[in-house]
Swiss-Prot record:
It comes from the Eukaryota. SUPFAM superfamilies: ARM repeat. Residues 1646-1668 are annotated as: Disordered. This is HEAT repeat-containing protein 5A. GO terms for biological process: endocytosis; protein localization; retrograde transport, endosome to Golgi.
């Protein structure tokens, strides 16, 4: 293929190829040429032009296929447009000659068609350059058209379209001729030709003769397919729209005599088409007289689409202006003045569907939310008008006149359409519609409620559905509406209309409850149940109302079931009783019944029993949890009787006639539906009877063939439906298109066919339910049930039934036979499907034969859907039999049929059967079998005489490729060649063949998979072919083929991304982003979603580049140039209604945001801001809110919330609330993304600095004003969902930016300036009408804002605090005083949210207060703090303190509730019957979730409060409370006023203590996987707070089992949670437990001493663990549990401590390591705990644990003793030394009973430390000598002398000191001197003297050495100074007779460092410091040891002179004065010295 990449065709390479390859080669060359020509210079093109033209024209004769001729024409046109146009006329003449040719052979046809295409392309590109040649050309083409076949007509139409496009107005002379040709083509038998003609006419058609154009279009709709309806409706709609808006007489259009047509005329024209179709007036009138309808459904559907195109073309603004006229016209289509449109119910339902579609698509799709609100008002007006008309008629006294009035009957359809659209509109508007319902002038609810009494059942149902929509959109109206309807129903029980109407309304409203998370009050269920019972009981009292009351009663019960188990469980007994009573008790009673009664009573009876069946079905569907064994047993008894009645129905029907026909069908349907849901075992005894009835239903058809077709789609495989009618495919017009599936005389689904469906959720999203007529529904249920029942009866019975079914097919004829066959096949299919699914078996051989005969017959049925279902059953049959030979036999049957049969039906059926076999049974093992299959399908795929056969064969081939897997590899190349050959040759008019080819190509790409990345020649060729195939499909005019192309490219991109041209793929995706075809849009989004996961930035760039290149193909809807691909997707999301597509758009945007939000921050924030601001009507809100602020804050508010002044055209016009919610969620995601990026996003100073450095830098903090503004706009919107999102955004902003400082105002944070805005955003959420979920969210934001510390000024803080206070006042009355609009659990949610918010504020206040109590350095600091507001911590606590008394009681009540709710189910019977303080017993399940979300912080706050009281406030009433309402008392916190038994304070404390401890332990014990970190941390902090106080500690200390249990729980937490913060918090609790145990032991010892009077005794009594044996029992020992826990922590951080891991019993020498900060903190905390343990033990016990503790402590020291710069100790070393000191100082080391053992163990420990450190061994070089030396020092100083003074240890210690003194490292030397300093000072001479004897001389030598060479740096200076300090200490501790000698050594060294006056000036800083140090020391030593001093100075004149000079030189700078008095005490000879010192 590379050889095809040249400017001229490489003929040499071309001629060497075979026929198929030649076509491929040419196509590849032409593809390349198109790109090359556009990139080549004009001169280069002209050089080669002549040859190139010849090559291109010669290709015309080579029979090019459709894609090739299109490319050829395109290249020819490009070539002439770039090069010279001299020879263009020759080219045109040549083409015309080819067209004129008389050769009509099929082989010459491609040449003629290529010539036609070339002409079109040339004229399109060159236009007027070609002069007047077009008249001849057009004439020639039109002449050719007369004899052309369909393909020719198709290409001619497209070519004429191009010619007219290129010539523009110049082509006017030809318009008439072209119009004539197009007119005939619009009604062509080929659908493709009709489409082409419509596209052609759209170019030049104007409103010259609108009537004839319209009539022509109406004719074109007759017998049309989906594509024709789309094209022709587009033509008609656009022409009519142009006619309405053509108002510029100066334009070129006016020269074509355009007349402006009024809107009324246009609408009348469309209305005529809708009502009369394409027939003329006379024919239509004749039809009316005959009472027949001449308008076929396809015409009506076509006109419906034209209406939509017409309005869409004119746009939303036009519709808004002309809404009233348009709406009344559309409604009139279903009006009484056009009875023909609605003369039968079937017609009426279809007509209503069309009207609803027009309204939904225009009002719902084009209008923004404001315009929709106005539309709602108009619709209400229309409803009122229609209501008045009805009232006028109904007021007529004559009942007959009333009921017979055509007005009432016909206006019903207008009302139904109006009500349904009203419901849809409000449903979509959501809570945005709230102002409308509050507007009394509109009277919206009244208008709907008024028509609930309409005589027509359809209207009553539509009104009920409309109420359902209002309730879903506005949950706050659900309960009031329910109350109103129940009240009316109770009050109007004697009106049949009221009973049915209001029962429908109540049922619809109950159906809405599942869509409203806040629910309805639980008590409503009881009211409804009572009313339903009352209706059922009173039904018999009044025969006029019997049927209505019966239906209403059961309808209410059925709807009640949708409320779920929580509600139904309370009424189940009554329901089961009614269920039992509705059926006779025995068959005998049933017989008696039959003989009594009349037609009417049976009608009522059947209605009642059908209703009861429906109620039980609803129960089984919605309350599965209640279906226990016991309930099932109570359900079953009436079933046999219900089945008995089923078998008797036919005889009852004969007896009482046709009035019972519908009730009996409904009864059957209800029973079948119930049985499908129940397990077959429950009706085992009736299986045979049921089966017989099913067989009778299925074989006694009274419906048409077309109607039965609806059964088949669910039985076909989803993929197979693609090869069938487009009606089965999802399109934007499916709502109206699906009518055509059933044929003209068949009813579509509609609500009035089954009122019981009003409370069920519609399968297709949220539109009104559309149940089919009972006659169809019963067949559907029967066929499903047949599958189940047939699988459970005995084999004999099964055989008999199948035989009976087969016979019934044989014995019927004609259309009737088709219906029976259809029913039977669908039933057998569901049977096979059921058996295959349940892994059952088919039965005897005979069964196989019957099944085979049945399916075989259907495989050859003329109905394609039936063939499809049969192919599926064929494969299922093989799957069920599961026998290789049988499967092979089936395949062989199909082979034989395909070889012999020539008819399309057999060939399509059996080819699909082969594919289905492979799908269910894989590759059917044998490759020979696979070869045969592929061979046959190849042959069929090339049968160009039948596109159907090709389509089915190729589809089957795609299934085989998919299922064969690797087995297919050998066939890949030939299959790919076949696909490419067919793609290049099959005419584009056969789109279905191309679609199947696309599926094959897709399957092949999947089969090749990642191998497509390979570089071998064969793979490269395959890849090129795949790409070429995709290119052909991308150019196909059919949208589904284009979708397949995109899907194939998506697969290719997944497996071989480098080889797919991303730029062209993205370009293709952008062009089709707003395609009118749903499936194409879905394919585009699915592909985009995949691309952006890998290459979001590249995709986005390509899209923008494409938009900048301003290609004309880009749809104006996708405004990529202005808003980028991201913005285009947001716009699309706003307009899109398909749920799957919306999901994909959101996913795509999320992926793009994740990878690009940080880089394109401004773009993303602008998009979100534009979406949120586009329809934010927040000017008013701002005014209202700021009015409530103080004057000074207005400026702040305005700074962020100014309204947009620039009302420029906005990329987002009126986005819907759902889009705005998504934008708000995006903002939160953007903030999260920035959090993981650069820290500058949350540091304004750094951000500004980096922005200055490079202006392209962008940081989130710079957009804070926008973030606040967006959050404000969202939080104050009308839409509740948006308010929730806005509050969440505000919460995220507060949490992320609370600590960002404001650089311009030190001590302040950046958020402080927005406090007015935050207040204004929060305030609306606390109004009385706000829903609880919004208030709950706002409470969370309030507490976050107060806790964030942003606001320091208490007055500012009070505003938000006041909101929480108001909430607290509201909730004080507990569950009694809260809203009755929602379920009680909603009140629980709100109460707990308020309490949680207060808890958070209190926790923060206490923490700040604690931090603030840390002593402040100076008073000035304190004053500054107050001035800066940082000292508001006490103030905040004061704010909370005012309400703390109330809060504490409420918190305790909430915790008690939570404790009750978390009890295991076995305690359910003991729970209080009325519920808890804040929940009711009935709603406890729903309430649990809210408690789970809130309990942790409430627990922490309660614990803090109890801590603050020290457990000494017995009654919370004593706490300050400023609230007057009484708090709900609970047993937990009853005051003396409660009237209950008064508890002692001790009991109250104990209860509270156990409540908090119990909740904590229960939670920590069984941590759920979804337990949040916040909850665990809060729980641990609560325990910490609890144990901060003596009283709870004493409880824990005295109850050892409790302590152990708690430790075990904490151990588990540490094991299961890796978070360091949680583990640290757990360790802190452990430490407190040990403290509690210590205190307990101390207390026992103290009291024992006091009791025994033994205070003077030396021995301590035996208290503590270990008693007098020292044994610690695992599970019973607190110490053991603590050790386990600490070992766990230590070994996790330092695995080397585990002897099992290291394989060594002792502390093994390994390289030390530094732990991370978290690890260090954990290890340190564990060591602190270990060091406390001996104090909890008895002396014997301490001996047991000491080895372990020492091993671990020394182990940590050894493992982490790393050398750090500057001689620092690592935190773990410091902790281990501290712990060591604690252990060594333990009283147990000195206790009489343990002293000896401790001494031995401590000596061993010291030996271990000494052994760790051996300078000879190389591996120890890493160890820090200072750490080990410090450890030795701790031993020396902290233990009793007998530990360290034994000679061997003492000698080793001294050696270590000597060794370190020799180390050159100055840091080590300094530390050694410091340690020796402390040892030398040790008061016990036995310890210190050996060290002094051994080391003093050594130190002296060192100092003299320094003295000789003088220090050169600070380190040496420090060493010297420390050395001197050690010598000074020696002097101090030395005995008197040695002291003079030591001073004599010390003084010369000090004096030698003194400088005289001259030297001091020039000395280095080190020498100067040394001088100062020496002088200072001399000044101190002189007076202390004056005699030695004097004698030394006297004996050495040099020293004396030096000292005098130094003092003299220093007299200015040194301020240290030696007191004269000391020297004057002993005057002597040394007067000069005295003089000097005196002088000083």
């Amino acid at each position: 293929m590379e050889l095809a990449h040249s400017l001229l065709l490489n003929e040499e390479a071309y001629n060497q190829l075979g026929e198929v390859q030649k076509a491929e080669f040419i196509f590849e060359w032409l593809r390349y040429l198109e790109k090359l020509l556009l990139a080549t210079s004009r001169n280069d093109v002209r050089e080669k032009q002549k040859t190139l033209v010849e090559q291109l024209l010669s290709l015309l004769n080579s029979s090019p296929g459709p894609p090739t001729r299109k490319l050829l024409a395109k290249n020819l046109a490009i070539l002439y447009s770039i090069g010279d146009t001299f020879s263009v006329h020759e080219a045109i003449d040549k083409c015309n000659d080819l067209i004129r040719s008389k050769d009509d052979s099929p082989s010459y046809l491609p040449t003629k068609l290529a010539a036609v295409v070339c002409l079109g392309s040339l004229y399109k590109k060159l236009g007027r350059i070609l002069g007047n040649t077009f008249t001849d050309t057009v004439g020639n083409i039109l002449k050719a058209m007369k004899s052309a076949e369909s393909q020719g007509r198709y290409e001619i139409m497209l070519s004429l379209q191009n010619i007219l496009n290129g010539l523009g107005a110049a082509a006017a002379p030809c318009h008439r001729d072209v119009y004539k040709a197009a007119r005939s083509c619009l009604t062509d038998r080929s659908m493709a030709v009709r489409c082409a003609a419509a596209k052609n006419e759209a170019i030049f058609m104007w409103s010259t003769d609108l009537d004839s154009v319209a009539t022509l279009c109406f004719k074109s709709f007759e017998g049309s397919n989906y594509d024709v309806r789309i094209s022709v409706s587009k033509l008609l709609g656009i022409i009519l729209a142009k006619a309405v808006i053509s108002k510029h007489p100066g334009t070129a259009a006016s020269r074509q005599s355009i007349r402006r047509v009024s809107l009324e005329e246009v609408l009348e024209l469309l209305g005529t088409g809708f009502l009369r179709g394409s027939s003329g007036f006379l024919r239509a009138s004749g039809d009316m007289l005959k009472g027949t309808s001449s308008v076929s459904r396809d015409v009506r559907v076509g006109v419906t689409q034209a209406y939509v195109v017409f309005v869409s073309t004119l746009g939303g603004a036009w519709l808004e202006k002309n809404f009233a006229a348009f709406f009344s016209h559309i409604l009139s289509l279903a009006s009484p003045s056009h009875p023909k449109a609605t003369q039968t119910q079937i017609d009426a339902v279809c007509c209503r569907r069309c009207v609803s579609f027009i309204l939904r698509t225009t009002i719902g799709g084009l209008l923004g939310e404001k315009a929709q609100l106005a539309a709602v008002k108009d619709i209400c007006q229309a409803i009122w008008k229609l209501k008045k008309v009805m009232d006028a008629v109904m007021s007529d006294g004559n009942l007959e006149t009333r009921l017979g009035s055509t007005d009432v009957a016909a206006s019903q359809h207008m009302l139904v359409c109006a009500l349904q659209e009203l419901g849809n509109l409000i449903h979509n508007l959501g809570t945005t519609a709230a102002p409308l319902l509050q507007d009394s002038s509109t009277g919206l609810l009244d208008s709907i409620l008024s028509v609930i009494l309409h005589p027509s059942i359809s209207v009553r149902l539509a009104a009920a559905w409309c109420l359902h929509c209002i309730a879903v959109a506005l949950p706050s109206y659900l309960t009031p509406l329910l109350d109103r309807c129940l009240e009316r129903l109770t009050g109007h029980k004697s009106s049949p209309e009221a009973v049915t109407g209001f029962s429908f309304a109540v049922a619809a409203l109950l159906g809405a409850v599942k869509h409203c998370p806040l629910g309805i009050p639980h008590g409503k269920g009881k009211i409804i149940m009572t009313l339903a019972e009352d209706l059922l009981c009173s039904a018999a009292q009044n025969s006029r109302l019997s049927a209505q009351r019966t239906q209403a009663g059961w309808l209410l019960i059925s709807a009640l079931m949708t409320l779920g188990p929580a509600v139904v469980s309370h009424h189940l007994a009554r329901v089961l009783l009614l269920w039992k009573c509705v059926f006779p008790a025995s068959p005998k009673d049933l017989e008696t019944e039959k003989s009594r009664g009349d037609s009417f009573t049976w009608q009522v009876t059947l209605e009642g029993r059908a209703g009861a069946l429906c109620a039980i079905k609803s129960f089984v569907s919605h309350c599965g949890d209640l279906l226990t064994e016991e309930v099932t047993q109570r359900l079953l008894p009436p079933l046999p009787c219900a089945v008995d009645l089923l078998t008797q129905l036919s005889s009852i029907l004969k007896m009482y006639g046709s009035p019972l026909k519908t009730p009996s069908v409904v009864y059957r349907q209800r029973l079948y539906e119930l049985l499908i849901l129940l397990p077959p075992e429950t009706y085992e005894g009736n299986l045979c009877a049921i089966l017989r009835e099913l067989a009778a239903d299925l074989t006694a058809p009274d419906i048409q063939v077309a109607a039965s077709t609806f059964l088949l789609p669910p039985l076909c495989h989803q993929d197979d439906l693609l090869i069938l009618s487009p009606f089965l495919q999802e399109t934007d017009h499916r709502f109206i298109e699906e009518q055509l599936l059933l044929g003209n005389g068949v009813a579509c689904g509609s609500l009035e066919y089954d009122p019981y469906s009003i409370y069920e959720k519609d399968v297709e999203g949220d539109s009104v339910p559309k149940p089919l007529p009972p006659a169809l529904s019963v067949i559907s249920s029967a066929s499903k049930l047949f599958g189940v029942v047939c699988a459970h009866v005995g084999e004999t019975q099964r055989l008999l039934i199948l035989e009976q079914l087969l016979d019934s097919i044989k014995h019927t004829k004609g259309a009737r036979q088709q219906v029976v066959q259809l029913h039977v096949v669908s039933s057998v299919s569901s049977f096979l499907k059921y058996v295959a699914g349940s892994k059952g078996c088919l039965g005897p051989e005979e069964m196989k034969r019957f099944a085979l005969t049945l399916v075989m017959g259907a495989l050859e049925s003329p109905n394609p859907l039936l063939r499809c279902a049969a192919a599926e059953s064929w494969a299922r049959l093989a799957q069920v039999v599961d026998d290789g030979a049988f499967t092979a036999g089936l395949a062989q049957v199909s082979f034989d049929k395909l070889k012999s049969a020539r008819d399309v039906v057999t060939r399509t059926g059996h080819s699909l059967a082969l594919g289905s076999l492979h799908r269910y049974l894989g590759g059917i093992s044998s490759s020979q079998h696979l070869n045969s299959c592929i061979g046959i399908l190849y042959t069929l795929a090339q049968d160009s005489t039948s596109p159907d056969v090709q389509t089915w064969a190729l589809h089957s081939l795609s299934l085989i490729i998919d299922s064969a897997g690797p087995l297919y590899y050998v066939h890949v190349e030939p299959t790919l060649s076949l696909i490419i050959m067919l793609l290049l040759n099959v005419p584009p008019t056969h789109a279905e063949v191309h679609q199947s080819l696309g599926r094959c190509l897709n399957a092949l790409i999947t089969t090749l998979g990642p191998e497509l990345q390979g570089n071998s020649t064969s793979i490269s060729t395959l890849r090129t072919s795949c790409l070429l195939g995709c290119a052909v499909m991308q150019d196909n005019p059919d949208c589904l083929v284009q979708a397949q192309a995109i899907s194939c490219l998506q697969q290719l991109h997944m497996f071989a991304p480098r080889h797919v041209n991303l730029s062209s793929l993205v370009s293709c995706l952008c062009v089709n982003l707003c395609s009118p075809y749903l499936l194409l849009r879905r394919a585009v989004l699915a592909c985009l979603r995949q691309l952006v996961q890998r290459e979001a930035a590249e995709v986005s760039e390509h899209a923008v580049m494409l938009a900048k290149d301003s290609r004309e193909e880009l749809t104006p809807d996708a405004n990529i140039r202005e808003v980028g691909l991201e913005g285009a997707l947001l716009i699309l999301l706003d307009k899109e209604t398909d749920e799957r597509l919306c999901h994909d758009i959101k996913e795509t945007l999320n992926y793009m945001l994740t990878s690009m939000a940080v880089e394109k921050l401004s773009l993303w924030l602008k998009l979100c801001k534009d979406v949120l601001a586009a329809s934010a009507d927040f000017t008013a809100v701002t005014c209202v809110d700021t009015m409530q602020e103080e004057e000074g804050d207005k400026g702040d508010d305005a700074s962020v919330l100014t309204t947009r002044r620039d009302e420029k055209s906005h990329p987002f016009t009126n986005p819907r609330w759902a889009t705005r919610v998504f934008a708000a969620e995006c903002v939160c995601r953007i903030i999260n993304q920035c959090e993981n990026a650069n820290s500058a996003h949350f540091d304004i100073a750094l951000a500004q600095e980096m922005k200055k450095r490079d202006s392209r830098n962008d940081f989130l903090v710079l957009h804070l004003a926008d973030l606040i503004r967006m959050a404000f706009m969202a939080a104050t919107d009308h839409s509740d969902q948006l308010r929730l999102s806005g509050l969440e955004m505000l919460l995220v902003v507060i949490r992320r930016f609370a600590t960002v400082p404001e650089p311009e105002f030190p001590g302040h944070v950046i958020l402080e300036q927005y406090q007015a805005n935050v207040g204004a955003a929060l305030r609306p959420a606390f109004t009385s009408e706000t829903p609880p979920d919004v208030t709950a969210k706002a409470c969370q934001v309030c507490s976050a804002w107060i806790a964030s510390g942003v606001v320091s000024d208490l007055n500012d803080l009070r505003r938000v605090h006041q909101l929480l206070v108001s909430s607290l006042t509201k909730i004080q009355a507990g569950k009694e005083a809260l809203s009755h609009l929602y379920n009680e659990s909603a009140s629980t949610m709100e109460i707990l949210a308020v309490l949680k918010a207060w808890a958070e504020v209190y926790i923060i206040a206490v923490q700040r207060h604690k931090n603030h109590r840390q002593p402040l350095k100076t008073t000035t600091c304190l004053e500054d703090g107050i001035r800066n507001g940082s000292c508001s911590s006490d103030g905040l606590l004061d704010l909370v303190y005012a309400d703390l008394g109330t809060l504490s009681r409420l918190w305790l009540a909430a915790l008690q509730d939570f404790a009750l709710l978390t009890l295991p189910s076995e305690f359910a019977s003991q729970l209080p019957a009325e519920g808890g303080a804040f929940y009711t017993a009935e709603t406890s399940e729903n309430a649990k979730l809210h408690y789970y979300n809130s309990w942790a912080l409430i627990l922490h706050a309660t614990a803090l409060w109890l801590t603050s009281t020290g457990f000494v406030v017995a009654d919370p009433d004593e706490g300050a409370s400023n609230l007057s309402r009484p708090v709900t008392p609970t047993s937990m916190c009853q005051g003396s006023s409660s009237g209950a038994t008064i508890k002692s304070p001790e009991d109250v404390y104990t209860d509270r203590f156990h409540l908090i401890l119990g909740i904590s332990v229960e939670f920590l014990c069984s941590l759920r996987s979804d337990a949040t970190m916040e909850s665990i941390t809060a729980c641990l902090h609560a325990l910490q707070a609890l144990l901060d106080v003596p009283w709870p500690r004493s409880k824990i200390g005295s109850d050892q089992d409790l302590g152990i249990e708690l430790l075990n729980v904490l151990h588990r937490v540490i094991l299961t949670r890796e978070s360091p913060s949680i583990q640290l918090a757990s360790l802190e609790v452990v430490r407190q437990i040990i403290c509690a145990a210590q205190e307990h032991v101390k207390e026992k010892r103290r009291s024992a001493e006091v009791d025994d009077g033994a205070a003077e005794k030396e021995t301590l009594p035996e208290f503590g663990e270990g008693k007098d044996t020292g044994g610690l029992v695992p599970g019973k020992s607190l110490v053991f549990a603590t050790l386990e826990l600490c070992v766990c922590i230590l070994v996790r951080q330092l695995p080397e401590l585990n002897p099992k891991l290291t394989g060594s019993p002792g502390v093994k020498a390994t390289k030390p390591q530094i732990l991370l900060e978290d690890g260090s903190r954990l290890v340190s905390a564990a060591l602190v705990i270990l060091s406390e343990l001996p104090a909890v033990c008895s002396p014997e016990g301490s001996i047991s644990i000491l080895p372990t503790i020492l091993y671990l402590t020394i182990g940590v020291l050894r493992e982490t003793a790393v050398k750090l710069p500057g001689g620092q100790l690592s935190s773990t070393v410091a902790a281990s030394l501290q712990a060591l000191k604690g252990i060594l100082s333990s009283p147990m080391a000195r206790a009489e009973k343990s002293r000896t053992a401790w001494t031995d163990l401590l000596r061993s420990a010291l030996t271990t430390i000494l052994d760790c450190w051996d300078p000879v061994d190389e591996t120890h070089q890493e160890l820090d000598e200072v750490s080990l030396l410090t450890a030795i020092t701790v031993f020396i100083l902290s233990t009793s002398p007998e530990v360290t003074t034994i000679p061997c240890l003492q000698k080793r210690c001294i050696d270590k000191f000597k060794a370190t003194l020799e180390i050159k490292d100055p840091v080590v030397q300094i530390k050694t001197y410091q340690l020796l300093h402390s040892i030398f000072q040790y008061p016990n001479p036995a310890v210190s003297y050996p060290y002094i004897y051994s080391l003093a001389s050594c130190i002296m030598e060192k100092l003299q050495e320094i003295d000789k060479r003088k220090p050169e740096n600070t380190a040496e200076l420090e060493i010297f100074q420390e050395g001197i300090k050690v010598l000074e200490t020696l002097v101090t501790v030395a005995e008197e007779h040695h002291r003079a000698q030591l001073v004599a050594c010390l003084l010369p060294i000090l004096i030698s460092f003194l400088l005289d006056e001259n030297s001091l000036g020039s000395a280095t800083s080190i020498m100067r410091n040394l001088h100062d140090f020496a002088l200072q020391n001399l000044m101190q030593i002189g007076p202390q040891y004056s005699s030695v001093f004097k004698s030394l100075v006297a004996s050495s004149p040099a020293l004396k002179a030096r000292l005098e000079a130094a003092i003299k030189g220093n007299q200015e700078s040194v301020k240290v004065k030696i007191p004269t008095s000391k020297y004057t005490k002993s005057p002597g000879k040394n007067s000069s010295i005295q003089l000097k010192t005196s002088f000083l």
